[in-house]
Amino acid sequence: MKLQINGEARDFDSPLTLAGLVDHLGMKADRVAIELNRGIVARDQWPQTNLAEGDRLEIVHFVGGG
């Protein structure tokens, strides 16, 4: 399955959920926000949000500082 993540085309095995994608990419769920096809998806919806061929995702990492 081809997905576009932050403007880059990537191939993944399907089926895949948003939670599975975050895990696969080695990201910490509490430190990212995800936009799927131009809509923000709440973190509690990630486990039941299935991804499909051609989906476009923007993943934003939160960085602390001060």
Predicted feature residues:
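Ubiquitin-like/PB1-type beta-grasp interaction modules and other compact soluble beta-rich domains
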Residues: 1-65
